[in-house]
């Protein structure tokens, strides 16, 4: 997918739209940190697109105030069925629950962590699959890089009682706390580093991140995962698959791999 070329810039989301009466064109809107240099980004992205044999007709930039930015991408985020009969609903969207499905409501000022991304869905699927054989009253589920707390809320829906989320970003930790509270879920949310700020262990660990933090964190995660526990990792894109595999194979046994679009999600256990 074209949008995967921009992932390291577009922390705040990418919108892909068709161009009216021009079926061979698509319009991509990327929301990047305004502190970044536009000319550098433009040059870098044009080079990436050229290398991928994708032609560019024009590149424009605008500085948006916060309210305009929020409205720009929020209108595109729709309720999604992340698991059978479990709906993730953005707080700003309506949902006609005619089939009486369970609803988790997520409020967020970032587009990632609203349930629409392939990696979130595949993590949720593996979480459901591997938690079914566990004692849900005893198991601890640790979500590394918890973001909005969405996977913790899915874990709570599945019946897991002891939930811990950790994120290095204060705004993310605060957002996770708010979403847990709004959905009446009890969870410990830590703002800090895995190695120094989480002193316990867990039978089930989630890490929906990207390749760079996974390379650093995989050895640390091994110390936090109990024997016979399950680690679910995602955020591994096709282009960096070969790069991460030595880090996985060094100390982990691959139980299962799921692929959604260009993204890979793994269920692992310690060797």
Regions from the PLM with identified roles:
Residues 7, 124, 153-156, 218, ...:
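A structural alpha-helix within SAM-dependent methyltransferase catalytic domains
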